[in-house]
Amino acid sequence: MVNKEEAQRLKELGNKCFQEGKYEEAVKYFSDAITNDPLDHVLYSNLSGAFASLGRFYEALESANKCISIKKDWPKGYIRKGCAEHGLRQLSNAEKTYLEGLKIDPNNKSLQDALSKVRNENMLENAQLIAHLNNIIENDPQLKSYKEENSNYPHELLNTIKSINSNPMNIRIILSTCHPKISEGVEKFFGFKFTGEGNDAEERQRQQREEEERRKKKEEEERKKKEEEEMKKQNRTPEQIQGDEHKLKVMN
């Protein structure tokens, strides 16, 4: 049931916490406010900002997308989305988002400044990546031969790597559409293969090892907890023990 008054009350509490730097509490208040008014775009914007302040950029992006889906003509939604993408280092995506916002409000100073900043970072990152890629290529005879065949090879490789960084969940799809020479360069850039049954088996083994480590860690924590409880029992005073015995008699 929609309760706008309660949503407004919770929103104000969330804003107060946000201003005080209590971002976890702000997330809770904004989330509770959304429960009371799930179609208020401002609440999703505020929630996105709180998540971003905590470095939880995937959640910030999700909230920003929801904000935009409710109110597409609100510039601040695009600021929130671009900020989340920036935090995820999806610089090309952030640039596109800020440009979308500027179509709605061409004179928005916040969008203009954010776009300028992300473009500068994108250029710097591209230069650093190209330098790193050229170093890899020069030290790999096979990749070096690809560059000799195609002088644009490093830039094609760069574009694919940036696509993967922007859409890491789609890495297999991206690589499946690439020329094999690009896929090979990408795998050498990241230092491991992404395709093939052998790699799937390696990934499963890695997951199994991690699961086993988590299980052992949990067992160790439980063992230590039991030991601490036993030590506490052994260190109890006579008065505490008599008190427990008295409680048992009363219960019986």
UniProtKB/Swiss-Prot annotation:
Q: What UniProt keywords are attached to this protein's entry?
A: Chaperone, Coiled coil, Cytoplasm, Repeat, TPR repeat
Record's protein name: Hsp70-Hsp90 organising protein
Q: What is its main location?
A: cytoplasm
Q: How does it assemble?
A: Monomer. Homodimer. Forms a complex composed of HOP and chaperones HSP70 and HSP90; the interaction is stronger in the absence of ATP. Interacts (via TPR 1, 2, 3, 7, 8 and 9 repeats) with HSP70 (via C-terminus); the interaction is direct and is stronger in the absence of ATP. Interacts (via TPR 4, 5 and 6 repeats) with HSP90 (via C-terminus); the interaction is direct.
Which top-level group of life is the source organism from? Eukaryota
A GO CC annotation given for this chain: cytoplasm
Q: Where is this region: Disordered?
A: 199-252
Q: Which regions form coiled coils?
A: 197-239
| UniProt cross-references to InterPro entries, sorted A to Z | TPR-like_helical_dom_sf, TPR_rpt
Q: Which SUPFAM superfamilies match?
A: TPR-like
Please explain the role this protein plays, according to its UniProt record.
Answer: Acts as a co-chaperone and mediates the association of the chaperones HSP70 and HSP90 probably facilitating substrate transfer from HSP70 to HSP90. Stimulates HSP70 ATPase activity and, in contrast, inhibits HSP90 ATPase activity.
State one molecular function term (GO). Hsp90 protein binding
A Pfam cross-reference name: TPR_8
Q: Where in the cell is it found?
A: Cytoplasm
What residue spans do the TPR repeats cover?
7-40, 41-74, 75-108
Does the keyword Cytoplasm feature in the UniProt annotation? yes
Comment on protein domains: The TPR repeats form 3 domains; the TPR 1 domain is composed of TPR 1, 2 and 3 repeats, the TPR2A domain of TPR 4, 5 and 6 repeats and TPR2B domain of TPR 7, 8 and 9 repeats.
For bias type Basic and acidic residues, the affected ranges are 201-233, 243-252
